[in-house]
């Protein structure tokens, strides 16, 4: 199946489970608030350099013979621990088409689940939107969504308690400090760098914004400034 279709299906079934879980938890706490999932299409640039340098590993592990068959189909493959996996492009998000729907639902008092999996990557072809064979980095789409909503806070939840540099936990960074650490290569290009980069993009795109990265289990404390790594302009 095309990657864009896989993204759409993932958004649908994960959104279904997530919105029902959130709704159930709210009702258990005596809170009556509607929860909605929005199937979200995100525009990417045809000329994004990521399409010439795919980096996102997807799919199952393959044998050398299976990998060769994938390459004959025109797909990119990379060796990983003696096996092979497919890799695809991970372009930056340019625009979010359903942003007005998300805003309308928020204004109506709903909790909105949007841009799941980084959004469905699409390109404009006249009046149509054509799915792209790509996976958008979720951190960048989260930052784009928060920016377009003019949010004051971006909260990125992960398995880490804090970001680290040289093995030392980071409590707070300005955008300039974060950029310097990125330039010096302190963050892993696959796992932590996109999170820091996305946070810098968010806080520098507006005024009085804060981005926070921390452990999922600490969300309550993170939003109150007690834990995690905070990035400001």
What feature does the model see in each segment?
Residues 1-233:
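C-terminal catalytic "cap/lid" subdomain
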């Amino acid at each position: 199946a095309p990657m864009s279709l896989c993204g759409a299906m993932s958004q649908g079934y994960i959104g279904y489970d997530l919105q029902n879980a959130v709704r159930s938890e709210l009702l258990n706490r005596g809170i009556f608030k509607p929860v909605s999932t929005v199937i979200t299409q995100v525009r990417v640039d045809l000329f994004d350099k990521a399409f010439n340098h795919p980096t996102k590993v997807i799919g199952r592990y393959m044998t050398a013979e299976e990998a060769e068959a994938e390459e004959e189909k025109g797909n990119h493959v990379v060796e990983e621990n003696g096996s092979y996996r497919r890799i695809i492009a991970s372009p930056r998000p340019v625009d979010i088409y359903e942003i007005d729907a998300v805003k309308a639902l928020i204004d109506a008092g709903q909790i909105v689940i949007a841009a799941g999996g980084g959004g469905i990557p699409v390109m404009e072809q006249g009046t149509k939107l054509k799915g792209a064979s790509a996976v958008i980095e979720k951190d960048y789409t989260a930052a784009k969504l928060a920016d377009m909503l003019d949010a004051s806070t971006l909260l990125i939840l992960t398995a880490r308690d804090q970001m680290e540099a040289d093995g030392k936990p980071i409590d707070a960074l300005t955008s300039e400090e974060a950029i310097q650490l990125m330039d010096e290569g302190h963050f892993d290009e696959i796992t932590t760098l996109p999170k820091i980069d996305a946070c810098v993009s968010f806080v520098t795109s507006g005024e009085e914004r804060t981005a926070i990265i921390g452990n999922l289990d600490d969300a309550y404390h993170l939003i109150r400034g007690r834990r995690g790594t905070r990035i400001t302009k």
